[in-house]
Structure formats: C-alpha cells, structure tokens
Amino acid sequence: SCLSSGALCGIDSNCCNGCNVPRNQCY
C-alpha cells in the first residue's frame, strides 16, 4: 500500500507520482 504522507512517500516503491497513487493505478 502507499504511504499517504510523510518523508518516505516519495520513495515508496509501491507508489508512483509521489504519494497516494498505488503502483497498479499508474498511467
């Protein structure tokens, strides 16, 4: 799952676009 906030959100490997966008919802 994506981190919704905090220093790590931009490097969360499960996310894209920084925060709040799950990898499987990337375009």
UniProtKB/Swiss-Prot annotation:
Q: In which tissues is it expressed?
A: Expressed by the venom duct.
- Function description: 1 uM of this toxin does not show any effect on voltage-gated sodium and potassium channels. Does not show antibacterial activity on both Gram-negative and Gram-positive bacteria.
Any one of the GO CC terms: extracellular region
Q: In terms of one coarse class, where is the protein primarily found? A: secreted
Anything noted about its domains?
The presence of a 'disulfide through disulfide knot' structurally defines this protein as a knottin. The cysteine framework is VI/VII (C-C-CC-C-C).
In-chain residues carrying the UniProt-annotated modification Tyrosine amide: Y27
> What keywords are assigned to this protein?
Amidation, Disulfide bond, Knottin, Secreted, Toxin
Return the protein name: Conotoxin Lo6/7b
Q: What is the organism field in this record? A: Conasprella longurionis
What is a GO molecular function of this protein? toxin activity
Q: Among its keywords, does the record have Plastid?
A: no
